[in-house]
C-alpha cells in the first residue's frame, strides 16, 4: 500500500498545516499517510472507500482522515477536492483541545464523513484561500495566524455539519442524502421522501441534480450498485442475494445496471477481474 509522507507535502519541517488542491481528483489507489487530512469536496462525484467501506461523495462532503486510516478514490466524475493537511491534533503551538471539534470514535464507529451546505462551503473556500495566502513564514505572529485560521475552519465545519442540525432546503437535502446512505435498500417513494424532509418534489429533484449531477433515481441506483460491489468483493453471498439485499427486485436487471455502471459484470467483480480499478 502507498504511504504518503509529510515531508513531501508540508512547506517546512515545522509547518503545522498545508493545503493541497486536487482539481480534479482522478481515481487514486488505496493509501495512508503519516499526517491527518480534512478532505473538502468542492463539486463533482465519486466513491470514497474509507477503511474498506464505500461512501458516495459530492459537493459539500467533508471527510476527516486520521494518520492510521486507509482510503482510495474511484469512479470519479469531475471530482474536485481541497485537502487540508495537518500533522496531528496535538502538533499545534497555540491550539489545544482540538479533538473536541473533530469527529470522535464511539463504540467502534468513526463518523468520518460530514456534510455542509453550499453557503457554508463558500465560507470554507474563503477560509482556505486565507490559509493559502498566509505564507510560509515561521515567525510567531505568522504561525499564530495560520493556526487561528485552522481553528476557524474546524469551528465552521462543526457548526455547519449535519451534527448541529439545519433548517434550510440545502441542509435538508444533505440530511436526505445521509438518510439514503443508511436506507438505500428500502423501497423509495420520492414524494414520501420529499415530504419526510420538508422539501417539495421539484426542489428535491433540482437540488439533488445540482449537487450530484444525477437525478434522484440515478443517484439511488448508483448508491445501491456501490454497496453491491462492496459485498461482491467482501462477502460470499450469491449475486442474486446481494441484488435483493441492495434493493433490486430482479437480479437480471441488477446485472444489466451493474455492467452499465462499472463496465464489469457482477461475476467479474466476484472473480477479482477488476483489479485495475482497485
From Swiss-Prot:
SUPFAM superfamilies: Homeodomain-like, Regulatory protein AraC. GO terms for cellular component: cytoplasm. Residues 174-272 form the HTH araC/xylS-type domain. One of its GO terms (molecular function) is DNA-binding transcription factor activity. The keyword Acetylation does not apply. It is found in: Cytoplasm. InterPro entries: AraC-bd (IPR003313), AraC_XylS_family_regulators (IPR050204), Homeodomain-like_sf (IPR009057), HTH-like (IPR037923), HTH_AraC (IPR018060), HTH_AraC-typ_CS (IPR018062), RhaR_RhaS-like_N (IPR047220), RmlC-like_jellyroll (IPR014710). Gene3D superfamilies: Homeodomain-like (1.10.10.60), Jelly Rolls (2.60.120.10). Activates expression of the rhaBAD and rhaT operons. Binds DNA as a dimer. This is HTH-type transcriptional activator RhaS. It comes from Citrobacter koseri (strain ATCC BAA-895 / CDC 4225-83 / SGSC4696).
